[in-house]
Amino acid sequence: MEELRNDWTLKEVEILFSLPFNDLLFQAHRIHRQNFDPNQIQVSSLLNIKTGACPEDCSYCSQSSKYDTGLEREKLMEIDLVLQQAKEAQDIGATRFCMGAAWRNPTDKSLAKVILMIQGVKTMGMETCVTLGMLTQEQAFILKEAGLDYYNHNIDTSKEHYSNVVTTRNFQDRLNTLESVQNANIHVCSGGILGLDESQTDRASMLRSLSNLRTHPDSVPFNLLVPIPGTPFENIEPPTESEFVRTIAVARIMMPKSVVRLSAGRTKMGEAMQALCFFAGANSIFYGEQLLTTDNPNINSDKDLFARLGINQKKVNNLQSV
């Protein structure tokens, strides 16, 4: 078994990225097999419980109030409707239900409503995850007391590149919230986005920041940017398929016991690319035809993909594996 490390240097990570592709994938797959069933995928479902009008200026995001993307603002969903969506997700095989709100940070009033959603989903026997923006330490403790399993808070990109992507917050703000979540003993879900005009060194730095947290994130989601018309990044050149797969492989090597999730952008990935990602160490996806405001493969398409690749869908929750 590989030793869990929290002391990676940037040079070490860059050396991993520079390995011949086949050597890198061989090393990543070996580590993946040591820690997980390589033919098993955990499935989550994501629901946007509050859409648009976010005051942040993330250059990639359709939900920012700073850009004209044609997205209509929607208020926080009613609890009954959220629970109905959770039940539908469970019926198609999702074991974790994630709820996202386009906020800079939740108000106490909004948080109280989200807590009722969390408690309702928990009664169904599903894992719960929310992404609500920045949290205070007190809010993190409140969410823990409510029974929250996971908190998603992506760092998006490297510390060095961050100000080129977002200016209404800084990289340390992200780390502060992750620290509050870890202090509350909530499982951390944190990853990034590829396709933000970042360099390979930026990808290496991002993975270094994630792996050098106090404890590794339990889940590490990777998004392939879906360019949104009206945002500053609408014409950004995407990474190549091999660059994306390399990032998955390096993440698996650096964080051997974390669940690595393919998130937004899978509609742009063919079967071979997804298969390479699974071989390199990805072992989770989101089910459902919509991820926040971007398209996602339909469920039957994913089931067919699993069947062709001989992949089994994880039937129970994932907490015992991380």
From Swiss-Prot:
[2Fe-2S] cluster binds at C98, C129, C189, R261. Pathway: Cofactor biosynthesis; biotin biosynthesis; biotin from 7,8-diaminononanoate: step 2/2. Residues 39-266 form the Radical SAM core domain. It catalyses: (4R,5S)-dethiobiotin + (sulfur carrier)-SH + 2 reduced [2Fe-2S]-[ferredoxin] + 2 S-adenosyl-L-methionine = (sulfur carrier)-H + biotin + 2 5'-deoxyadenosine + 2 L-methionine + 2 oxidized [2Fe-2S]-[ferredoxin]. It comes from the Bacteria. The keyword S-adenosyl-L-methionine applies. One of its GO terms (molecular function) is biotin synthase activity. Transmembrane segments: none annotated. One of its GO terms (biological process) is biotin biosynthetic process. The keyword Transport does not apply. [4Fe-4S] cluster binds at C54, C58, C61. Its EC number is 2.8.1.6. Keywords: 2Fe-2S, 4Fe-4S, Biotin biosynthesis, Iron, Iron-sulfur, Metal-binding, S-adenosyl-L-methionine, Transferase. Coiled coil: none annotated. InterPro entries: Aldolase_TIM, BATS_dom, Biotin_synth/BioAB, Biotin_synthase, Elp3/MiaA/NifB-like_rSAM, rSAM. Its cofactor is [4Fe-4S] cluster; [2Fe-2S] cluster. Binds 1 [4Fe-4S] cluster. The cluster is coordinated with 3 cysteines and an exchangeable S-adenosyl-L-methionine. Belongs to the radical SAM superfamily. Biotin synthase family. Homodimer. NCBIfam families: bioB. Catalyzes the conversion of dethiobiotin (DTB) to biotin by the insertion of a sulfur atom into dethiobiotin via a radical-based mechanism. This is Biotin synthase. It comes from Ruthia magnifica subsp. Calyptogena magnifica.
